[in-house]
Amino acid sequence: MSWTVGILRASQRAGTVRANFLCLGMAPSPCPPAATPLGGAWAVAPASKMATVKCELMKNFTSEEPVRNSKISIVGTGSVGMACAVSILLKGLSDELALVDVDEGRLKGETMDLQHGSLFVKMPNIVSSRDYVVTANSNLVIITAGARQEKGETRLNLVQRNVAIFKLMMSSIVQYSPRCKLIVVSNPVDILTYVAWKLSAFPQNRVIGSGCNLDTARFRFLIGQRLSIHSESCHGWILGEHGDSSVPVWSGVNIAGVPLKELNLDIGTDKDPEQWKNVHKDVVASAYEIIKMKGYTYWAIGLSVADLTESILKNLRRVHPVSTRIKGLYGINEEVFLSVPCILGESGITDLIKVKLAPEEEARLQKSAKTLWDIQKELKF
């Protein structure tokens, strides 16, 4: 944060009132004559030697109004929230980064840590507070906060507890940044994206779930490992739920336009002698494996969220598999959010790509929707 100390001294000359403001902040400001003592009856803060040093160091010509091109706020400074913050900072995607968390000690510590490294990421304005006013006028708000599942707790009960948390978050976010876009990262992400959409009353293009963007990255990485090809050159999608019922679209997997299904008709099925279906199994299992070994997954999701952020704030119109409302598509009639390929730009989700799925893939997507709806229909708002 930047801390500003203002010292006001009034003097009257020739019937006019002149006010001098001495600021110990980033914006330049006029300085009083060196012989004039600071303070007096009008002082609102104690005099500081730094005021003299600043005035000796600089000659001010005009006041400077802060110009902000973009502002990102992150709600939640746990491992995932901070991985998102660092990934965004390293990409230089905004002029201001605001952090919000209920844990004041952790929040202050994480903020100071980032501020001390701001020289290396060219980001001078990193602010934080427990109060959502710090998020005011955000272009993008990223939600990583939420309740964790307790031992033996049902998924429905976990989601219901998160609904209560999201009610508090969304009312403040909407109050201070009514035109922002939302990226929901908290799990279960598809259901909580639906919750955020319902509570915010934002149009669906401005409420985005991180969804299967990371699942797809894992999928492409593992395909690339099998073929000894960089994952960027492996084209394939994971759609549906971010979780166990996700759908690998084997019918569309290709390398340089060559569909792998033309080379192996049984790819991704039980009849496949190469057992490519294990690639998707590894995608689903990988998060559990990482959690078992190190406790959390956060770096990959942080990089994934920064990738989505870049597409939105730079209006790149890239296609990402993110969670959005898909009622009326693929035979799905429930009010659910699932990942499908979407074009992301400055308005959020500008378009949805109507991917042609094989019958068995569409059936799995419908099953994924039912899994989510069975929980959503029981939620109390």
UniProtKB/Swiss-Prot annotation:
SUPFAM superfamilies: LDH C-terminal domain-like, NAD(P)-binding Rossmann-fold domains. The keyword Nucleotide-binding does not apply. The active site is at H242. Substrate binds at R155, N187, R218, T297. GO terms for molecular function: L-lactate dehydrogenase activity. This is L-lactate dehydrogenase A-like 6B. Gene3D superfamilies: Lactate dehydrogenase/glycoside hydrolase, family 4, C-terminal, NAD(P)-binding Rossmann-like Domain. Its EC number is 1.1.1.27. It comes from Bos taurus (Bovine). It is an enzyme of class 1 (oxidoreductase). Belongs to the LDH/MDH superfamily. LDH family. One of its GO terms (biological process) is pyruvate metabolic process. GO terms for cellular component: mitochondrion. It catalyses: (S)-lactate + NAD(+) = pyruvate + NADH + H(+).
